[in-house]
Design a protein with these regions (language model features):
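Alpha-helical transmembrane segments
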Residues: 21-25, 31-59, 414-416, 424-453
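Interfacial "coupling" helices/loops that link adjacent transmembrane helices in transporter permeases
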Residues: 18, 254-296, 737-780
Length: 855
């Protein structure tokens, strides 16, 4: 036998002759690389987008240092490891105009544009020049026209100051989300106030080591350097990357092995003949690997290119590339991030696994006796069971079932692999369906817990009297404004709650809070006021629409939003997320409550008769001569989240009643929070006009911040949409791979028995009887795979549940029945459809060809 070039010629001939197997393997590899490439690109691109969005809220710096002097700042500016540094001078000063309050931030140019860009004009160069966001100008009653002089009143001394508007900044996400109005100006040259420095290190600079070095150089305390919450953390990306690659490799290798095993078994007789005429085992192994890798190397560029194209299309459809994100004064372009290194590693790992499978398979084939390979015994043992003996058949259908059972156990390896394929496919689809459900919960929770509870928000940054906020007359005008469809309101009355020591609480947290507040303010939110042991809270009056929105957050008890009695109260209690190991209290449904109130308990409050709660005497519990009214309520329900924005961020329980009842207690109370929705039929121009109208109406009341949250809501919706696209894409590609594997496996099972089936057809078996037998076999394997998937899906879904935040927010584990049933029905449907694909050799006119068929 010729050795040079002959192996290459033979393996190419095999690839051309067995086109179906070659095409199946090509599609398997191509879809694998397509799936890997899409997932890796989208994972890295989304990580970039999430990182950019976090930086728009928490600054793009790595850390910040407060309390510096000019010499220390100059030392930082000359540090070669620092990429940039932004400086702010002293504390923000409060200025008022148009009944609104805005903070004046003194700093360098970079401090103004860390999270924004200049939309129009220029940045301030000196103190007295200002750059402001457009929505802030509108709230201050100022038209956004560059070059005009602004008259603002200093909140501290009441003096008017002139400022020149030199620039208009893009919206800063955090400011708009919480209603914080800021103006940026230059630093005062004569000021001796301390400086705040935001620092960004150069790439590859080790963070912890550099922080320790700066602490020593600047001679500051260990805790003086604070890490920015949005500092890029690649570790989470790499962990998620490894998890995704692992899952994809497992699924794709299972499918590949199924297809390749059939391909190998089909060619074994030819391999046996080659061995018989002198081919060595090593040559056989080389030829097998050449076949595999020729398909593999053609599939790599095809699958990768298709993956890049699919990822680009998804990002284009999702609108990510059109996002306007400004950082460090420039628009941060969202571009396709192709992780070539990760893709290359995946290709190498896949190539190694493919080669290992091919090497092991070729070695096994080479070790078999040549005569067995030629006769296609494949080293296997024919397995028969007495229970499937045809002699025991009582009817024609009984004989069909027994024949099907006999064929099932004759080739246990193929049967087991078919069952495994069905199991993996059903489990994967069920897991993806469950992940889709968790994403829907996450979307809703994120929207509500981020206070994106209305298209327009009118809130306060701070209040300490019940008559501060939107007057009720003005609130009525706002609610009746053309274009407004829904209104939710909250009015608050500062109260003191009689502290019942019998009520359990998080003693450790409240003790730390008490010490911290005493150190900073000299008083705390809890203490003895001369008559009672109390803690400060608020009695919030919600309108009927806002009360309805509380229903999903009920932890215990119940209430009627339309008929909440005057002696009933709803208590909003924060909890500690035990799964996260403590941390800060949050609006969790599960976990340890900050105070252990229950539905049916009584709670007593008291409030000042004159409602003068904006004095220092009230805050430090020294107003012993004031008159108070006592009220006792019965807790109707305990909720985990107050829904309406609490700008005071109260960690003690909030008390909620109906707005109509609160008005009877305090007729002069105002509205501190309003959420409004516009008419769905409004155009973009009409929505902008409505925003302007609401800003004008809101500015008629002191300290009210009015803004549109439509962009923020759409951002949250887009995040959900993208994730659903990924899940759908994974499901479709995986479905194609599983169907391809099942088709090849079941077709192989039919081809290997062509001779026997043709003999049965010759003695009277009809095509319908053969199809019945195949239906029994395929559906039996499918049913076993489905049952196995049902058993294994429970721990997998429970892991997904525990790994998410669903439990913390009150979403208990529920098996994904709908997704499982759809996957099971789909698997059985594939088994049924493939049962009707009878080979041509089994047809009546080709029975003779089938009897002499060489497999």
């Amino acid at each position: 036998m010729r050795k040079c070039g002959e192996d290459f010629w033979l393996h190419s001939r095999f690839l051309r002759k067995y086109k179906k197997n070659t095409i199946a393997l090509f599609f398997c590899f191509s879809l694998t690389f397509l799936l890997m490439t899409v997932l890796l690109i989208l994972l890295h691109t989304n990580f970039l987008i999430s990182d950019l969005q976090a930086k728009t809220e928490f600054t793009p710096s790595d850390c910040y240092i407060d309390g510096l002097d000019n010499a220390q700042v100059e030392n930082l500016r000359t540090d070669p490891d620092i990429s940039w540094i932004a400086i702010e001078q002293g504390e923000g000063r409060i200025y008022t105009r148009n009944n609104q309050q805005a903070y004046l931030i003194r700093g360098d140019e970079l401090s103004a544009t860390m999270m924004a860009g200049v939309v129009e004009g220029r940045l301030p160069e000196n103190y007295g020049e200002v750059a402001v966001e457009r929505w802030v100008l509108l709230n201050l009653g100022i038209e956004p026209v560059i070059g005009q002089t602004l008259l603002l009143t200093d909140f501290e001394n009441g003096k008017e100051e002139e400022f020149i508007l030199t620039g208009i900044l893009s919206d800063i996400y955090a400011n708009k989300r919480y209603g914080l109005m800021q103006m940026h100006t230059g630093m005062e040259a004569s000021s001796t106030e301390s400086l705040l420095a935001y620092i960004k290190f150069k790439d590859q600079v080790p963070y912890n080591e550099k922080v320790a070095e700066l602490q020593a150089e600047l001679e500051i305390k260990n805790d003086s350097i604070k890490e920015c919450p949005a500092r890029t953390n690649y570790r989470s990306l790499y962990v998620l990357e490894a998890e995704i690659i692992g899952v994809v490799l497992i699924v794709c290798m299972v499918v590949f092995y199924g297809i390749y095993r059939i391909m190998l078994l089909t060619r074994l007789p030819q391999y046996g003949m080659l061995r018989a005429i002198g081919m060595k085992r090593k040559q056989l192994t080389q030829m097998v690997l050449l076949e595999l890798y020729e398909i593999f190397f053609i599939s790599v560029p095809v699958g990768t290119a298709l993956g890049i194209g699919a990822a680009w299309l998804i990002l284009r459809i999702s609108g990510d590339m059109d996002q306007h994100i400004f950082l460090s004064g420039e628009r941060a372009e969202v571009q396709l991030t192709i992780p070539w290194l990760a893709i290359g590693v995946c290709i190498l790992i896949t190539g190694g696994l493919v080669g290992s499978i091919g090497l092991v398979s070729a070695s096994r084939a080479g070790k078999q006796r040549i005569i067995e390979i030629v006769r296609q015994k494949n080293g296997g043992k024919k397995r028969t069971k007495n229970s499937f003996s045809i002699d025991n058949a009582q009817s024609k259908n009984g004989m069909i079932l027994r024949m099907g059972g006999k064929y099932l156990v004759c080739d246990l390896k193929t049967m087991c692999f078919t069952v495994l394929t069905v199991c993996v496919g059903v489990m994967l689809f069920t897991g993806l369906a469950y992940k889709a459900r968790t994403l829907e919960y996450y979307r809703n929770d994120t929207r509500e817990l981020s206070y994106l509870n209305g298209q327009y928000a009118m809130t306060m940054l701070h209040y300490n009297r019940t008559d501060q906020g939107i007057s009720r007359e003005n609130a009525e005008i706002i609610a009746q404004t053309s274009g407004v469809s829904q209104v939710r309101t909250s009015s608050s009355l500062p109260v003191r709650v009689i502290d019942n020591k019998a009520v359990g609480r998080n003693e450790e947290y409240y003790d730390e809070l008490y010490e911290r507040q005493m150190e900073i303010y000299g008083y705390s939110d809890a203490g003895y006021d001369g008559k009672d042991q109390v803690y400060k809270s608020f009695l919030n009056g919600y309108n009927e629409e806002a009360l309805r929105c509380l229903k999903p957050y009920i932890v215990e008890g119940d209430f009627d939003p339309e008929n909440l009695k005057d002696n009933q109260i709803i208590v909003s209690v924060l909890r500690m997320d035990q799964r996260a190991g403590g941390g800060l209290p949050g609006p969790y449904k599960e976990g340890s409550p900050m105070m252990d109130y229950h539905a049916g308990d009584e709670i007593q409050i008291k409030y000042r008769n004159d409602f003068r709660t904006d004095t220092e005497e009230y805050e430090n519990f020294s107003d012993t001569d004031a008159e108070y009214t006592y009220k006792t309520y019965k807790i109707a329900a305990v909720v985990s989240f107050p829904f309406m924005y609490d700008c005071r961020h109260t960690v003690y329980p909030l008390l909620i009643t109906s707005d109509s009842y609160l008005k009877t207690i305090s007729p002069g109370s105002a509205i501190q929070c309003m959420y409004l929705d516009g008419d769905p039929a409004l155009s973009e121009q009409e929505r902008n006009e409505l925003e302007g109208t609401l800003i004008r109406l809101g500015s008629e009341n002191a300290s009210i911040s009015t803004r549109s949250l439509i962009d923020e809501i759409e951002r949250n919706e887009m995040f959900y949409f993208k994730r659903m696209v990924y899940i759908t894409g994974i499901a479709l590609v995986s479905l194609l791979l599983v169907i391809m594997n099942m088709t090849n496996t079941l077709r192989y099972r039919m081809q290997t028995r062509t001779k026997e089936i043709s003999m049965l057809r010759a003695v009277g078996y009809t095509r319908r009887m053969i199809i019945k037998m195949l239906l029994f076999e395929n559906c039996a394997m499918g049913a076993v795979g489905i049952m196995l998937a049902f058993i294994l899906s429970w721990p997998v879904l429970k892991y997904l549940h525990s790994d998410s935040e669903m439990l913390a927010f009150g979403h208990s584990f529920v098996f994904e029945s709908a997704g499982f049933l759809i996957a099971a029905a789909g698997a059985l449907l594939v088994c049924i459809v493939l049962s009707f694909r009878v080979p041509a050799e089994w047809k009546t006119r080709r029975i003779a060809d089938g009897i002499v068929h060489v497999e």
